[in-house]
Amino acid sequence: PKFLQALVASAFAYAVMTFLMTATPISMHLMEKISLSKTGFVIQLHIAAMFLPSLVTGNLIKRFGHSKIMYMGVLLFLVTIITSLFEQNFINYMIALIFLGLGWNFLFISGTSLLVLCYREEEKFRAQGYNDLIVYSIQAAASLSAGVFLSLTSWKTMNLICLIFLIIIALSTIRADLKKNPSN
């Protein structure tokens, strides 16, 4: 259960983040007519939110545990989705993309750091290989499909689609936690 929890958190966090981030410039600039400089600024803030928390995420995982940081990542992603359901303007895109970056950081780092605790020494190359193949294949599919989904649906619908992946992440984490503590 822990290996699956780590894999699901990492893969779907990357998929959700890539799916929405890739569609953002198209939605902001081409569809909503927000300036290219503001669109670029939102992406810059998003990237900062993806990586700056890494300075403390490891310590948060040590203090609170992998699962709690994963739940926090899901909640941060939920803020992204909720914000995206309101008016599509510069401020809402900015808030949504900052929380998208923060959620990705918590989920991806907690997932990848949990992964190394889920296998024996002789399994490490195979386990890491499977993980990377699945994570980056799903991420590539999300990137390639973002423009298609945006053209066929809407920014709001794309965000709602991401709820499915958040539910899967939460359920895999709950399952792993219950297996760890069967008395719950």
Give residue ranges: language-model regions:
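Short amphipathic helix-loop junctions that connect adjacent transmembrane helices
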Residues: T22-V42
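Helix-to-loop junctions at the C-terminal end of transmembrane segments
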Residues: L52-H66, L150
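Paired small-residue
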Residues: T80, I91-F99
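Intracellular juxtamembrane helix-capping segments at the cytosolic ends
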Residues: F106-Y119
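A late C-terminal transmembrane helix in Major Facilitator Superfamily
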Residues: E123-L152
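A membrane-interface helix-boundary motif in multi-pass transporters
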Residues: V148-L166
